[in-house]
Every structure is written in structure tokens, then in C-alpha cells.
Amino acid sequence: DKHNKNPYILKITSYYESKKYKEAVKSLETVLQIFPEDKTWWVQLGSFYLLVEDYKKGLATLDLAYKQGFLEKESQIKTLASLYSQNEVPHKAALLLEKHIASGLVKRDDKNLSTLANAWHAAQHIDKAARYYGEVAKMTNLAKHYSKQGMLLKQDEQFKKAIVALNKALELGVKDEGRVHMSIAE
């Protein structure tokens, strides 16, 4: 008794195209009970939960999809990392991004590294956050990233490195010069 996916695909597509997202979610929940091994449905259901602004279920579904190895695209990993951060699990967001930036699935660019640095910062891993802000600063040559790196290094009591980063921020014309000068003086 093999189930046919086609009627479900048509039904879900019809709901989606007529912007009946809640009905599409219900259909996808049914489909997943019948075809739990189909990775496409897991990813779609997670995305549809986000469309209807049920972020907790979206996170739970995409987290489960990830644990089953169903998330294979950069955008899917970044969405899951974002959901972890929004749901106050920045440590998981940081680990996920770090792993997939290292593997090459997620591009090692200033935007993704900045997101990674922010996640480590939110997770209170000051040393890692400072390291990634430093990498972003070297990549972009922007004062604000050197300033963030310097402030975090100072917080982590790595004063010599902090002064180097803060001086670089000043050299590049950081906006809040007074605050940076005060941090160096402290």
C-alpha cells in the first residue's frame, strides 16, 4: 500500500499559491506522518511555520531536519542559526555557523563572520567573539569592527591586544572616538 505523493503536492501547492499558509501547514503535517523520510517536506514545513509566524515550531522542525541531515543549503543553515539566536540559544547558533563556515557550506565572508561573532558574543564567549570580529575587521578594514574587537579584548583582560585594535579603530576614524580613547586610558 504505497501512498501517492502527487495529490498532496497539488493540495499544498494550491494552498501556498492562494496564500492559505495555515492550510498548507496542516497538509504538510499530514504528509510528514505518511512520508517521514522525505527531507523536502521537513524543510518545507519548517519554512511554512515561519510564514505563519510560528517560530517555535519552525525552530523545532528545522532543528529536527538538521539532526537528520536534511539541511544541505547555506540559506537553510543560516535560517536555523538565526532561529537559534532569536530563541535565545546563541551558543547553538555559533556552533552551527562555525561548523558550516569551516566546512565551506556557509560562505566565509564579512556578513557571516560578523553574525558568528555576534552569536559568540551573545553566548558570552568573549575570546571567540573578539577573534571573529578581528577577522571581519581585517577583511573589511572598518573601524567599527576593530572597535568591537578591542572592547571585547579589553573585557577579556587582553589589554595589549585591545590597545592595538582600539588604536586601529581610531586610525580608521571610528565614530565614538571619546569612548575608544577612554577605553585605552583605562
For the regions a protein language model found, what residue spans apply to each?
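Alpha-solenoid helical repeat scaffolds
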Residues: 1-186
